[in-house]
């Protein structure tokens, strides 16, 4: 039996649509062992598929097939801390758990690059799967087969406050609202800000983040699908956030604050409640630089 720890992820980071993502200190756990049948259970009562449609099982089976092996069955126990359909990489966590677990069971025939590529092929884009696997902040380009990526570990005195509503937003719906084409001007707008985000985060020029998270490719459209989104942004900025953006496809809003900004999450939550937005919860995290880990093996 092996036990796997997989971090939540926050993708896009404002202007870095489908290219930038980072891992957070917020984890799912999966226990996995080979079996002669499919046995899947939830350790914490969160409803998960218990048949061969389970995404962890599907991903593990894909890896076995890539390696020329047949997966007869799998025994899985899932602890799902990461909320589903909230823009925090819950599906990517399942994919990466399945791949890393299966690769470990087979004696690690695939390299890290192989796993990054296979995860992106399953998910369709690497902005959540790559940081879930690698940790840190990851810049990635997916050409349909191969992911070209750079991971950078981040040791900054920042906290990331995930402001999570009590409703879901499916990625399919969040993508369907996006335009088929954008102007050259808007493309340049995003390119410059995506580059500014990474450079500012890594060099400590945090005052740039408010500009760097601005975006014209996805956030203006997705805000219309997230009730009270603009008000949540305003509240976070009023309490001193460096930058605020929609995490992944949403509906979670991520606020970046300085470590010295004491009780930031609590102050944001207090203001949300006073504004009649008590359905939004606030959780503070740091950047996870380790990525997915095998934390027990016997």
Where are these regions (language model features)?
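Active-site rim beta-loop-alpha module in soluble metabolic enzymes
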Residues: 162-224
């Amino acid at each position: 039996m092996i036990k796997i720890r997989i971090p939540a992820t926050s993708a896009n980071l404002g202007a870095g649509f489908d290219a930038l993502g980072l891992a957070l200190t917020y984890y799912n756990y999966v226990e996995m062992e080979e079996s002669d049948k499919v046995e899947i259970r939830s350790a914490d009562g969160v409803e998960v598929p218990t048949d061969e449609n389970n995404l962890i099982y599907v991903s593990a089976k894909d890896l076995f097939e890539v390696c020329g092996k047949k997966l007869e069955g799998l025994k899985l126990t899932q602890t799902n801390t990461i909320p589903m359909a909230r823009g925090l990489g819950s599906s990517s966590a399942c994919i990466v758990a399945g791949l890393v677990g299966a690769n470990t069971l087979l004696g690690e025939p695939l390299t890290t690059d192989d796993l990054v590529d296979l995860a992106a092929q399953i998910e369709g884009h690497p902005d959540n799967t790559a940081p879930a696997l690698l940790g840190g902040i990851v810049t990635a380009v997916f050409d349909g087969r191969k992911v070209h990526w750079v991971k950078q570990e981040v040791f900054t005195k920042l906290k990331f406050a995930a402001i999570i509503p009590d409703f879901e937003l499916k990625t399919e719906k969040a993508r369907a609202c996006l335009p088929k084409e954008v102007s050259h001007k808007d493309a340049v707008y995003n390119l410059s800000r995506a580059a500014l985000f990474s450079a500012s985060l890594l060099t400590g020029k945090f005052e740039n983040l408010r500009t760097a998270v601005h975006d014209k490719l996805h956030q203006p459209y997705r805000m219309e699908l997230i009730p009270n989104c603009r008000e949540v942004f305003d509240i976070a900025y009023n309490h001193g956030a460096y930058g605020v953006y929609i995490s992944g496809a949403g509906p979670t809003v991520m606020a970046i604050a300085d470590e010295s900004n004491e009780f930031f999450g609590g102050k944001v939550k207090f203001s949300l409640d006073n504004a009649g937005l008590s359905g939004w919860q606030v959780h503070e995290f740091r950047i996870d630089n380790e990525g997915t880990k095998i934390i027990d093996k016997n």
